[in-house]
Structures are given as structure tokens and as C-alpha cells.
């Protein structure tokens, strides 16, 4: 039975049956057959071919990358079937027969029975070019990639054109350039992993040095919906980072929307994340109290900027120590904006119309109770998360730990506060990071007290009594440690 009867006419190449795609790529890789079809692929440029050659040097399939790039320009399994007809690769046509609609199967007979050019009745892919033109010049006529099309659609739906401005103001790079920058996304270049992607260290030409490349991976979700979600997160982060420039927000340098794996390029943060430094990973030296003060205030200012700049506040939605990054000067910068949303400020207790959201998937230990139970989304969600971060900075403890009798950090701090009151001692004597240098002088003691107090206030279960980010920063500044002269 021919199972192609129910096949949609528009199936992007990466979403065809995996085993069929692998068999096709194996044949195209043999004797570099893929190079013979590349000139017949509209939209494929010489630099794409060169990038595929470099990709093969990393023991990867060059034909798989070629097909992924071609798909990103708007070409489907139907176009691939027609390409094989045009280049008379009958074996590959038969191999992928089940992946295209039956009305195109007549092309196999055409190829078998004739050595002439395939009938003009076949649907022509947009922007067809000859092999000779590919050799002489870059092909400029091609369909927009699904990513670019989605970006364009989102831009048109945005009344302030923020996405269009973001894309126009940010350097586009090719997937091949990122492959070269990261040595083929080598495992040795991995500097971080998360639920939505992997971050690689790389050296990208034109950016002046080392960069961080975030590659949004599919995990176990290779569906079209999964691909769209990864694209949505990339576009959301691109729009936010390009729109909001601040000393404490991670700068974005470039982006790539080719293929099924969108990538964003950022400033490389040589001191890693706040989480890394609090846990002293890789043998790093514990943060001093002056550094903790500057990180707390700087990160607070960055988050406060998002909440207060513009008519509509930006809610980050995933504030945690892993998403506060530290540059070579230990200056904090907030990153990972893939989950952020426009939202509501909740400055008054009588706020009656908070945004109800179901798409924020922030780390559970940092999520406010009103979001967990009712999906209520206001700026106070970020305030709650930041309160947890401040308690981590004070104590060096994780936001959640199975090894503690009281697993949640807020509850753990409250237990210690009650214990300190019973012993008639300051809570800082119990709730303090033992790895940090000893407190020196009243200023450092006062700052730690403030850190604990405002951390608990920010992480209050009642969102209506939580302070705003501007109030938190103001309070920390009043109780800050004078800089060392």
C-alpha cells in the first residue's frame, strides 16, 4: 500500500521520516554526490557549499547540513523530489516516494523513460537558477526561510515594529559561520546547558574576539510545533535584547535563523554565572561581600529597567542565579530572555487585572505561588524570583535542596530567623555563606542584614506586599558597603 496518499504537499525536509532522510544523506555523502546537486538548488550560495565542506571535516554529514540550509529557505520534500528528478537520481526518488504526494509520482516514469529535461508541468521551486550561475555568482533570488517568514509575520503584527527594528539592527550570520566559530559545535566548546539550548564558546569573525553562541536544541521534540517554539523563543529574545540596552542586560551581537536550530550570539561572560561563583565551581574563589553587593545592586537595576522602561513592562519570567552572568569585571548582566513577556506593573494592592499566562516555564523553585496556582503574571513574579536570588547570595545555599530538612530556601531562612530570635542573636550569624570571607566592619554586617531582609520581603507569598524592584535597589544602596579606595 502506498502510504503517500495522506502526505501533505508542504512538509519541510527536516520533518520527513528520519530513517528516510538518513538513507538519502548516506547516499549523497558517498563520493560527495551532494556537490553535484548543489548547483541545481535555488538559494544555495557558494559560501553554503564551502560551509558544508567544512562541516564534513568534523565527521558530520555535509548533505544533511545542505538539505537543512535549503529547507530554511522555504523548500520542502516536494521540491527535493523534483530536484532528484531534475538531476535524474531515480534511486533517491524511489527512496523518498512515500514522503511526497502521489500526484508527483509520475516524475519517476518521466526520468526512467526519457533523458530529456523533466516536464515543465512539475511545480517549479521559487527562484530556479542554472548550475553555471551558481558557479559565477551568488544566487540572490530565493524564498524567505520559515524563520524569516515567521519573523516578518510577527513584525507585521507588532504595532511598534520592535522585531523588525531588532532584526535590522542586529548582525545576521550564517549557520556555517557559527559552525566554524565553534569547531562544529564541539563538546569541548560547551560552556552551559539548559532546558532550551546549549551555549558554546566560539570565535566569530567580525565581532572582535570570543563570543557565546546559544543553539536552541530540539531535545526529544523534533515536531514542527517544537521547531516553531524554538523559533519563537529566539525571536522573543532577539527582540528584547536588541530593544533594551542597559549595562546590566546581556548584549546580543548576532543571530542565525537558518535551519531547524536557531542560534543567538552574545558577549562572552568570562566569569560564568552567579550560580557558578556562589557554588565555587571549577575551583573559583568565593565572592567577597563587596562583590556580592555590586552584583545584587547591578542585577536589580537591570531587572528594574525592564520593569520601568517604556509603556509596557517586560517580565523576564526566569530570573535565577544561572541567568545572571558575570563579565571579566564581575559586572552582572541578566540573560536568557526566551521566556520573557510584555506584562503588567503591579505597584498597588488593588491591582485587579493581572495577566493570566500559561507559557512561562521558569524554574519551579523560583516561581511565585500565585503563578504556580493561577498563572498570574505581573512584575511581582520577577520580584519573587529576585528575592530568592538575594537569599542565595547571602547564604550560598541553593534555591531548593533535597539535602536540607527545610528544602525551600525561603522557608529555610524563616526557620533560621526564628532560631536566631530564640537565641537572641542576629540571623546573619546562622544564615550566612560559610565559604565567603569573614564579615569586616559594621558596613558588611549591615549589608548582609539588608540582603536577608529585602530577600524575604521580595519572596513574600503575598504578591501585593512585595516591594518593587526600584524599592529593592534603593534599600540595598542605602545599606551598601562603601567601595574600597
UniProtKB/Swiss-Prot annotation:
Catalytic class of the enzyme: transferase
**Is Transferase there in the keyword field?**
yes
Q: List the disulfide bonds.
A: none
Stretches the record annotates as Disordered: 115-155
One GO molecular function term? protein serine kinase activity
Provide the Protein kinase domain boundaries.
185-485
- Disulfide bond among keywords: no
One GO CC annotation, please?
A: nucleus
Q: Where is the composition biased (Polar residues)?
A: 115-132
Where is ATP annotated to bind? 191-199, 214
According to UniProt, the reaction catalysed is: L-seryl-[protein] + ATP = O-phospho-L-seryl-[protein] + ADP + H(+); L-threonyl-[protein] + ATP = O-phospho-L-threonyl-[protein] + ADP + H(+)
Task: Tell me the GO BP annotations in alphabetical order.
Answer: cytokine-mediated signaling pathway; innate immune response; intracellular signal transduction; lipopolysaccharide-mediated signaling pathway; Toll signaling pathway
**Entry keywords, A to Z:** ATP-binding, Kinase, Nucleotide-binding, Serine/threonine-protein kinase, Transferase
Q: In which tissues is it expressed?
A: Expressed in the nervous system.
What does the record give as the active site?
318
Looking up InterPro entries in the UniProt record yields: DEATH-like_dom_sf, Death_dom, Kinase-like_dom_sf, LRR_Rcpt-Like_S/T_Kinase, Pelle_death, Prot_kinase_dom, Protein_kinase_ATP_BS, Ser/Thr_kinase_AS
Q: Where is the composition biased (Low complexity)?
A: 142-152
List the EC numbers from the record: 2.7.11.1
Its job: Through association with the adapter actl-1, may act downstream of the receptor complex composed of ilcr-1 and ilcr-2, which is a signaling complex that modulates neuronal activity and animal behavior in response to sensory neuron input.
Xref: PANTHER family: LEUCINE-RICH REPEAT-CONTAINING PROTEIN DDB_G0281931-RELATED (PTHR48006:SF102)
Summarize the subunit comment.
Answer: Interacts with actl-1.
Q: Which family does it belong to?
A: Belongs to the protein kinase superfamily. TKL Ser/Thr protein kinase family. Pelle subfamily.
Protein name from the UniProt record: Pelle-like serine/threonine-protein kinase pik-1
This chain's source organism reads: Caenorhabditis elegans
